[in-house]
A protein has these predicted regions:
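Canonical positions in the second alpha-helix
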Residues: 73, 117-118, 155-156, 189-191, ...
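N-terminal leader/linker segments that initiate helical-solenoid repeat arrays
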Residues: 2-126
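Structural marker of alpha-solenoid helical repeat scaffolds
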Residues: 76, 121-125, 159, 193-194, ...
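Helix-start (N-cap) detector for alpha-helical repeat units in TPR-like alpha-solenoids
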Residues: 47, 81-82, 126-128, 164-165, ...
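Register position in tetratricopeptide repeats
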Residues: 59, 93, 97, 140-142, ...
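Residue-level recognition of tetratricopeptide repeat
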Residues: 55, 89, 93-96, 136, ...
Length: 312
């Protein structure tokens, strides 16, 4: 069900995309780091038992064990580069796989702490993986850390680190910082690199264009999402944003049509009913407006907008 958060500016909805993309993001970093680890194993015949056990756990996808091994070593040797990096990578992997945001941020903080310490080593200057993971970790921290996410993702990108999701995460971070022009540029690069862009990428580009008041461009991406997406939730959100564009530009009939399509295809929705009330109020039909607000209130007695309109 849509709520007020669903229609807020894109920068404040950064976690929507993050949670949906968690599994994909994990796959990207796993491939990159495993290749590097394979090289380490080949050139270091004198590898310690601790490293051997950690690498075994990592390559098996047991990030919890690899994280714990690295923690144990760091408790005794807190500045060892290899274990700092592996703790940072493992904690990041665990963080993005969590359902609970509090658990996610706990692991993300651990990842950032270890990777920042690893950056104190000279070896980190040529290790783009650290900046890549650190940038994504800061992106998960939210809008307040978007400047750091941008900083480290750009360092990784300038080091020619091969990760296809850098432009998309840069787009997210620029949007979170309010730099929607740079956000559009980054998202557009991600779009060009992807023959089949995700719903979230299409919605992200659209929302950045909306924030720039370039509604014609936004509508193109929203319509593409509606036409191509197999996901009903993405389609509902695209229609909702499209209705908002129509309403704000005075195309009330087109906005009303989008709201009713949402209701017909997705069932009753308190937020849609409330927005219909707002639409009718703009048209001067206060009777229909109050009727829609009452429906919204009955469906969701906690709906702040409906309660305010009805003086409840």
């Amino acid at each position: 069900m849509l709520n007020n958060r669903s229609v807020s500016r894109y920068g404040r909805n950064i976690y929507l995309l993050k949670k949906i993309r968690a599994i994909t993001a994990a796959a990207v970093i796993v491939l990159a780091v495993v290749v590097s680890i394979f090289i380490i194993v080949r050139i270091n015949s004198g590898i310690s038992n601790e490293k051997r056990e950690l690498l075994k756990a990592w390559n098996a996808g047991d990030y919890e064990l690899s994280c714990q091994i690295s923690r144990n070593v760091l408790n005794q040797r807190p500045v060892e580069y290899f274990f700092l990096t592996m703790n940072g990578f493992s904690a990041y992997q665990l963080g993005i796989s969590q359902i609970n945001n509090q658990n996610t941020l706990s692991y993300i903080d651990e990842s950032i702490f270890s990777l920042r310490k690893a950056m104190l080593h000279n070896a980190s200057k040529n290790d783009a993986r650290i900046y890549y993971v650190l940038g994504k970790a800061y992106a998960y921290k939210g809008a307040e850390y978007s400047d750091l996410a941008i900083k480290y993702l750009k360092i990784a990108d300038n080091m020619s680190y091969d990760a296809a999701d850098i432009p998309e995460y840069l787009g997210l971070s620029y949007a979170a910082s309010g730099d929607y022009r740079s956000s559009v540029a980054a998202f557009s690069l991600a779009f060009r690199q992807n023959e089949n862009p995700s719903d979230n990428l299409l919605l992200s580009i659209a929302r950045s264009y909306i924030s720039l008041d370039e509604n014609a461009m936004a509508m193109g991406y929203l319509i593409r999402c509606i036409d191509s997406s197999p996901d009903s939730k993405s389609i509902v959100l695209a229609r909702f944003l499209l209705a908002e564009i129509y309403k704000n530009s005075g195309d009330y009939d087109d906005a009303e049509e989008q709201y009713f399509v949402i209701l017909n295809e997705g069932g009753e929705n308190a937020e849609v009913r409330f927005q219909l009330g707002e639409l009718y109020n703009l048209k001067g039909d206060t009777t229909r407006a109050r009727s829609e607000w009452r429906i919204a209130y009955r469906q969701d007695p906690a709906h702040a907008g409906a309660r305010a309109r009805l003086n409840i």
